């Protein structure tokens, strides 16, 4: 099921507001996930996971790029994210629960940075968007 037009518009407006800082916010979300859910670090043992590390920033930018791709292709997330899904599910064998945990952290981060804008409507739209992204990424796990 695709996102409703109002949800798509709300998510796109948030992305526009975040602008060139999407990578910064995605990095913060990763750092939150690593600190709050240490089991997720299992997939990153080869990286320096300290706060502010260049390796976490680089991966945060990859997350940001993937989410931006998703925002640009809201009408067909499974197709847009197919290569990413294949890599994470088939090659890296990421536990789908980790997508949920990152999704939670991706929700908390803009709420912290944009408290005046983080209305119940924005919250709901972002939850729906992240749920669709997670579903598209984890669909091969079923």
Swiss-Prot record:
Keyword Metal-binding among record annotations: yes
Entry GO CC: haptoglobin-hemoglobin complex; hemoglobin complex
GO biological process: cellular oxidant detoxification; hydrogen peroxide catabolic process
Domain of life: Eukaryota
GO-annotated molecular function: heme binding; iron ion binding; oxygen binding; oxygen carrier activity
Residues holding heme b: 59, 88
Keyword field: Heme, Iron, Metal-binding, Oxygen transport, Transport
Domain Globin: 2-142
Pfam families: Globin
Classification via PANTHER family: HEMOGLOBIN FAMILY MEMBER (PTHR11442), HEMOGLOBIN SUBUNIT THETA-1 (PTHR11442:SF15)
Similarity comment: family membership: Belongs to the globin family.
Protein name: Hemoglobin subunit theta-1
Biological source species: Equus caballus (Horse)
Gene (UniProt): HBQ1
């Amino acid at each position: 099921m695709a996102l409703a037009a109002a949800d798509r518009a709300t998510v796109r407006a948030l992305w526009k507001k975040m602008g060139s800082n999407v990578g910064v916010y995605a990095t913060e979300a990763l750092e939150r996930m690593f600190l709050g859910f240490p089991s997720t670090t299992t997939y990153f043992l080869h990286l320096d996971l300290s706060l502010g590390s260049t390796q976490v920033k680089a991966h945060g930018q990859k997350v940001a790029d993937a989410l931006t791709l998703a925002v640009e292709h809201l009408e067909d997330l499974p197709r847009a994210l197919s290569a990413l899904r294949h890599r994470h599910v088939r090659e890296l064998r990421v536990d789908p629960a980790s997508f949920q945990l990152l999704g939670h952290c991706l929700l908390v981060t803009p709420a912290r940075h944009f408290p005046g804008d983080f209305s119940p409507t924005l919250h709901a739209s972002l939850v729906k968007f992240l749920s669709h992204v997670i579903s598209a990424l984890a669909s091969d796990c079923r």
